Amino acid sequence: MSESLRIIFAGTPDFAARHLDALLSSGHNVVGVFTQPDRPAGRGKKLMPSPVKVLAEEKGLPVFQPVSLRPQENQQLVADLQADVMVVVAYGLILPKAVLEMPRLGCINVHGSLLPRWRGAAPIQRSLWAGDAETGVTIMQMDVGLDTGDMLYKLSCPITAEDTSGTLYDKLAELGPQGLITTLKQLADGTAKPEVQDETLVTYAEKLSKEEARIDWSLSAAQLERYIRAFNPWPMSWLEIERQPVKVWKASVIDTATNAAPGTILEANKQGIQVATGDGILNLLSLQPAGKKAMSAQDLLNSRREWFVPGNRLA
């Protein structure tokens, strides 16, 4: 076995917790865990710990929850742990230059894309949104830029025609820990080979918004079907009927030309709700009216057929 490293782990959501879990089984010494402060969640707005905090406390690890790492006293928390390396996975706080330089081997990050493609906040969703054939994880050495550091290790996986951001997230949550453990071994052995990112290949994965997820019928059916998968499970593609938002969970493309204006309902039957787009027909298969559970088009038509009269246009 390689040298056992003293590791600080910094992360917040379930995706990060899966990486911490792998680290704890790897023989390395996790000396401290940084995660975001508890946040109000649920209907009662009760303060809830992050998945990383829950796991760290279960395992008896010291947990730190600073609001920022800019204050000197919070940076001292990192320095006092005398770590060999800091592993950062979906932490959500900026690491100042002073913190990046504290561990002997620096700070490394698990990023959910094949860098330099999709630097930024929403790499999983944007890879689907753009119609990429594959994605993966990149383990990189962190610097002060946004996902600009040297790449240490990559693992890729295909994006299938059925993938949603939810299923891709799960795939990358399996790949990430594998890549992380391999990278740590290479760092410990001195065999890591940093690779500079090619700036000519950079794309940016901008944050998603609920407004962006509103269905724009002027786009092609193929684009819309992809966006529906990219925005599932958040923020969810949606359309508005009688001033109510209706989420769309699943749709398919019917490769038939139509002269109808985009947004025109062509048919509504047990096969789905067929709507004209800027190019081709989108068949809505699973929808969720406000305050209800997701249901098949057939079930929605049974209760709300007046919403989907052929010839009418959806906004």
Curated annotation (Swiss-Prot):
Keywords associated with the record: Protein biosynthesis, Transferase
Annotated GO MF terms: methionyl-tRNA formyltransferase activity
Source taxon at top rank: Bacteria
A GO cellular component entry from the record: cytosol
Keyword Lipid metabolism: no
Record has Protein biosynthesis as a keyword: yes
SUPFAM superfamilies listed in its UniProt record: FMT C-terminal domain-like, Formyltransferase
Database matches in Pfam families: Formyl_trans_C, Formyl_trans_N
EC annotation from Swiss-Prot or TrEMBL: 2.1.2.9
Catalytic activity reported: L-methionyl-tRNA(fMet) + (6R)-10-formyltetrahydrofolate = N-formyl-L-methionyl-tRNA(fMet) + (6S)-5,6,7,8-tetrahydrofolate + H(+)
InterPro entries in the record: Fmt, Formyl_trans_C, Formyl_trans_C_sf, Formyl_transf_N, Formyl_transf_N_sf, Formyl_transferase-like_C_sf, GART_AS, Met-tRNA-FMT_C
Residues engaged in binding (6S)-5,6,7,8-tetrahydrofolate: 113-116
EC supergroup of this enzyme: transferase
Function comment: Attaches a formyl group to the free amino group of methionyl-tRNA(fMet). The formyl group appears to play a dual role in the initiator identity of N-formylmethionyl-tRNA by promoting its recognition by IF2 and preventing the misappropriation of this tRNA by the elongation apparatus.
Family: Belongs to the Fmt family.
Listed name of the protein: Methionyl-tRNA formyltransferase
